[in-house]
Each structure stands twice: as structure tokens, then as C-alpha cells.
Amino acid sequence: MGNYRWPSKLSKLSLRAKQTNLYRVILIAILCVTFYFVGVWQHSGRGISRSSISNHELTSVPCTFPHQTTPILNFASRHTAPDLPPTITDARVVQIPSCGVEFSEYTPCEFVNRSLNFPRERLIYRERHCPEKHEIVRCRIPAPYGYSLPFRWPESRDVAWFANVPHTELTVEKKNQNWVRYEKDRFLFPGGGTMFPRGADAYIDEIGRLINLKDGSIRTAIDTGCGVASFGAYLMSRNIVTMSFAPRDTHEAQVQFALERGVPAIIGVLASIRLPFPARAFDIAHCSRCLIPWGQYNGTYLIEVDRVLRPGGYWILSGPPINWQRHWKGWERTRDDLNSEQSQIERVARSLCWRKLVQREDLAVWQKPTNHVHCKRNRIALGRPPFCHRTLPNQGWYTKLETCLTPLPEVTGSEIKEVAGGQLARWPERLNALPPRIKSGSLEGITEDEFVSNTEKWQRRVSYYKKYDQQLAETGRYRNFLDMNAHLGGFASALVDDPVWVMNVVPVEASVNTLGVIYERGLIGTYQNWCEAMSTYPRTYDFIHADSVFSLYKDRCDMEDILLEMDRILRPKGSVIIRDDIDVLTKVKKITDAMQWEGRIGDHENGPLEREKILFLVKEYWTAPAPDQSSDP
């Protein structure tokens, strides 16, 4: 007991330190376990995480696309392609201003003030004369105050809102010809015309007694000097689609009326350049008092009709000078003058190897030969015009008119009935039958297999579009369609059962000129350079489709100018679908945001791994202001 030692002060302090460290270890362990279970609880979805707060903020933003069925794809902040411009936040997007109300019917390439600088001879001043780069108007064209969505087809054939085309000139100048009447807040189209006082239906029935309009052999027509396009409007019920054209002149609203009625039409004139169509495009050509001097200038204008007329096609003429013996007093012309004019026309038609089928009362019909076998043999006897050499018959963009005859493709035999270029199927089989230009191998790289697969591809794509856009899927919501890069016309062919018509554009920059194939399918279209404005009025189309257009025009012209032209020709509340590489669409959407279009980017129909995406857009409704109000929406 005497050897026992009490613990020293130092040993007591050491014991207390060990106890404190133990407590700390236990406390840290408890906290770690607690944080672990809290983390598990949050990841299970029962907690409020930062991501869930962020999602709540996103979903609270209102969206005006009730038909949206797939997620919006947003590449603006995360896409890092080297050629993209710096990201612009929504707060910094500069809106493209609206134009003044004086631009509400602006047609850039048929602008009256500019056209007066060109020769009046042969109406050259009424041809396309587009602005220079420094003259391009870079603002959004307003609809007139009070603009309303057009009536739906077929009601639109007979009625249009006055506020949409606020012109009464035709109701005065053509009052006795029953073109158009103005009643209260709308225009009525009785279907009359200068040469069809009993109406367009009765007039077409008269033509049908001379040539067969019912068996599907006649599908495409061209109407020169169309007026308000009643001829084309009433042919639609007979499954004949008509390209109507007229110049922008004192009857300044005639083509605009046609488009408002839901009838295909463009601004155009026969003057010094070819029509913007390929050779052998139309089954019939029509002129009802169109006032074109067919027999003058060495028959140049009839030679151009011959170029675009299909082998075996018909040219129909009514009005001066046909039946001049009866009408010469009413036309306020002399008998000798009218007789001379008809003699000139007859002489030119014979020189083209046309055969006059019939002249009955106010109608005359000529037929183009199915081939040029006999025409070439008789060329020495006929004399002028000679056959063209070293010319491209399908060129139709700023190509000068010629006084030579466009030769038809060679035929294998000497039969007069053998169709040069190949016999076309009758409508509706014509739509999906192999076009002769593909069958002959004249289009490089386009085969029968590609044609079939292209048709099937666009059937799938249009079905996919309709799942995204309920307005497109709604029968009758849209009438006037534009395909800016139509290729083989697959987009239009997929819509053939809908009550719509499609203007199929083949850009002049396209690697292969396929517009002839489009016409051989029984569809219509035109050539166009999208660095320039289209020859049409503002608010022409309900729907615009642009497949790879901006990739095609990269480094050719300003993307903003193309989009502003699309804005000009698109109706308020109209829709646009743009397909292109995602880098391109990202740039496009920044501009359409500045144009105050509403849009979203969706996946390719084959899935999200495709670089090509689809931009769905809607143009907002806005108009020119009421008096003393700002024009910007």
C-alpha cells in the first residue's frame, strides 16, 4: 500500500483529451450518416432540389403552341460550332422594324417607280427589275388595317374580304363584264369575264365540246393575261391546275385577287424574256382577250408558247381577232385591221407546224404536233422560223426570247403520233408514274429507284409534320402553299388529297433542273433565285416549306433578306417549316425571333441523332395601324 502512486496532473489531462477526441469522432460519424440519408432522400424525388426549382420556373413560362407534342430543342446556349455568331440573349435581340403602310402591297421586282426607268417598248418596263443591294427594303411589310384571314376553299373562289385587297378599280372598269362586285365588306366573284358573259363554267363547257377535258389527258394549263383568274378557278373542279399570270398594271389587283381567291397565280408578262417555266410543261395554253400581239415581232410570243406547250398540247384563243366579223364594232376596230391580225396569227401558227382544229363562234383551237419529224422535213417550204441550235430549252430565268423554234426531242420512228419526249400517263396516275425525263436518263443522277424512294420519303415527312402542326393537319385551314426547294415535287405529291395547291420552286442554283419532272407529274411550279424577291404580292401564301434552302444559299446572299422575303409573301398566322443543318437553323431562328415569329426546333423524323433538324414557325398576326397609331406590333 505504501508503494501505490496517485495519478499525476499530466496523466489526468491526457485522459480527458482522449475522451474529447472520442466524442468528436462519434459526432462526425453521426453527421456523415445524417447527410448521407438526406442525400438519398433528395435523389428519390421527395426533396426540393435546385433542378426541380429550375424546372418549375421553365414550365411556368406560357407557350402558345398547344399542338406541341415533343420537347423543344434549344441549341442557342450550348451549341459550340466554330462558325456560329456570339450568342445573343433574348433581352438583347433587336427587333426588325415594320415598314410604313405605303409598303403594304410592295412588290420589289415590279416596283412602279423603278420600272419607269426602263423602255416601254414591248412592255419591257413591266418585266422583273429587282432592286440593287443598296435599294433592298429591310423591314417587315404590314398587312392593311382590318386584314382578316381569307375565306376557306371552296368558298374563297367566290368571295374575298375588301380589307384584304382594298381596291375598287376593277369593280368600276370591268363593271359590265361581271369580273368582280363590291358589296358591303367583301368582293364577290360571279365567274364572269370579258369573253364569257355567261360565266366561266359555261365557257369551259364550250371548250370541253371542242377538246376532251374529262379523260385526264389534260392536267396542266397556263392562262396568259388571266384577269382575276376565273378560268383557272373553275378548271380546278375538273382536276386541271392552271398557272395564271398577268402584269402589274392599271388593274393592279388582278393577280392579288386571284391569290386571295385561293387560285395559283404570279405576276408576269410576255415582253423580252422567257416565261419562268421549262419546255413542254403545259397541256393547254389559254388567252381570253389577253391583248398580247401574237402575230407581231416575228411571232416571238407564239414561239414562246410553243416552247412551254407539251407535244400534242392545245392553244385556245378567244377575243380579238376571233369572230371579228361579229364583234368588230364593239371592239372599236376596223374590219381590215382585225382581218390582218388574224391572218398574222394563222401564218405564225402554220410556221410552228400547229394544226388548227376548229374555230366555233368566239373560240379557236390549235394543236401542237406530237413530234417534229414532218416539221423538219417541211422546214424549207415553211421558211421561218428556223430551229434553234445550241440553246437550252428548259432555261427560263432571265433568258431572252428567241425567234427560232425549240426542237422537240428526237423520236425513234417516223410515226406522226409518236410523242416526243415520251407519252404521259393520264391524271391521277400521272402523279406517281415514272416521269419520262427520268425514264430517259436525261437528268443526271436521278433514277427510277430514287424517284420512288423520294415519293415515299415525303409521304412519311408530311405525316410527321402534321403531328407537330395541328393547323397543317386541319383540313381547309391552309390553301396556298409554297415549296421553296421542291426537287422532284415530293412534298406537293404528299398533299395531293388535301384541298391545297403548291407552287413548286426549283432554285436556279439547284444542281439539277427538275422543274420539268414536276410538270410531268401534273404539278406546277416556277424558277426562282431566292437572292431576289418573288414575282408575287405580299401575303400570297398560307404555308411555306423550305428544305435546305439556307444551306443552298450560304455565301450567296444575306440570310436576313431571304427571311424578310418569306415574311413579305406569308400571310398573318401563316406557318413555315424549315429543314436544315442545326448550325444553320440556330442562325435562322435568331433572325425569325427578331421578326417576331414564334418558333421551335424539333428533331428529324428519324430521331435526335440526325444533324438535320426542323424549325417550326408561325408568323404573328399584325396589321398596319389605324390612323394616328404606331405601326409596330
UniProtKB/Swiss-Prot annotation:
Any one Gene Ontology BP term: methylation
Entries under SUPFAM superfamilies matching the protein: S-adenosyl-L-methionine-dependent methyltransferases
Protein's UniProt keywords contain Hydrolase: no
Residues carrying sugar: 113, 298
Lumenal side stretches: 46-633
Topology of this chain in the membrane: Single-pass type II membrane protein
Record-given protein name: Probable methyltransferase PMT15
Record organism: Arabidopsis thaliana (Mouse-ear cress)
